[in-house]
Amino acid sequence: MGYATKSPWVIHYDASSCNGCDIEVLAALCPGFDVERFGIINTGNPKHADIFLVTGSVNERNISVVKQIYDQMVEPKVVVACGTCACSGGIFHDCYNVIGGVDQAIPVDVYAPGCAVRPEAIIDGVVQALGILDEKSKALKAAKRGA
Amino acid sequence: MGQKTIIPFGPQHPVLPEPIHLDLVVEDEVVLEAVPQIGFIHRGLERLVRTKDYNQFIYVAERICGICAFGHSMGYAETIEKLMGVEIPKRAEYLRVIWHELSRIHSHILWLGLAADAFGHEALFMHCWRLRERVLDLFEKTTGGRVIFSVVKVGGVNRDIDRGTLDEFVRVLEGIKDEYNQICNAFLKDPSVYNRTAGVGVIPTEDALGLSMVGPFARASNVNYDVRMLGNGAYGDLSDFKLITSENCDCYARMEVRAAEVVQSIEIIEELAAKIPDGDIAVPVKGAPADGAEACNSLEQPRGECYYFAKGNGTKNLERMRMRTPTSQNLAGMAVALKGCDIADVNMIVLTIDPCISCTER
């Protein structure tokens, strides 16, 4: 990927993670790692967001919230699963209340592993997500032209 | 007079890194009642002790919460050591307390940053988190992890800190102090911050005691209780431990208490780093907890007293593990503080209890 055609805004939701990944997501946005230099801004509004960063393994209670946020986001959109729990359920995979992985709830495009996920892995995931976002938006435009 | 409206707050809200849902019953701009709903992070970790070995569970205990990760692994290990009658080496006790106080520094600076974000001071938020990175670097250097450390084990600790690194701890923390004081100036002396926080979300001392609030939240309401003053482990060897309390009982007082606790933690680390004895860092632990044996333990987490209870059944798996975490104690206080406040102050008040929902719901 040569350059990003867009400065993506991200939205973050904690779907039953232990909090470790959440503070790493925030740390990635802060001066230590500073993803704002790529134009990435954290937003609270799903309608403004291009990239959805989900942490945690998703439980019975918050699966509807995860789905709702995903549905409210406007196309094209990319989901990044941050942390081992979000990828597969991780250490909590055999807990009774855990569904096990964000991909059980919504389609996931990029998996960023780590327990807790390192900010470098999040940045790498978001950069990959940018490429996918570009492809999705091209496909969307082509479909519109075709119609 | 307007009519009553219910405004939902959360679970997805920019001010909260973790989900909690509040139903705010609002008349005009005033909150009449706040009804918290929890369960968004419940995983069922206390049930996991039945399927995991007591040595394995320490890694699960650490992942109860990513901010107080070290505190939970330390509290769990101490409980199991009490359960099995293990005495750990003095050096391990010192190392645990040094790391634990370091995690208190990182947690409080993190909280100060989030509080700045809640009252709309984004530059201050960024400055706090920049400072916090330097504390995390110390963690990374000695344990290998930034937020999850896996360094405590039943019977001691996994890694030692050598003399040179301890000196570096002291040097880095001394270096942080100057910058930290500048940041504190902005929090405690800036009139715009003062006007935003003073007199907001007041909880008088009697109410704080009645609601059994714990930690800095209670100490800001002038409750003089801190588990560290009981002198468990290496805390007993401190030459002096002064409680930090405030009489203002409002959001400003909570900021004041936490800001002062960071300096106190730096002093504790400096004293213990100078005093630390030589010796082993762990003792081997064999066997299993006896059938019916029970142990309890409490520990001052960054957010307040955390209470642990464990019961053995003669096998390597525990019969029961129970934790009472500081935020679950403080949620009642939060609901009281929210009553009658302005809707614009809700996020400020919710944040000043330093909610750690992952701990609460496990």
Each predicted region: which residue ranges?
Chain A
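Iron-sulfur-associated redox domains of electron-transfer enzymes in respiratory
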Residues: M1-A147
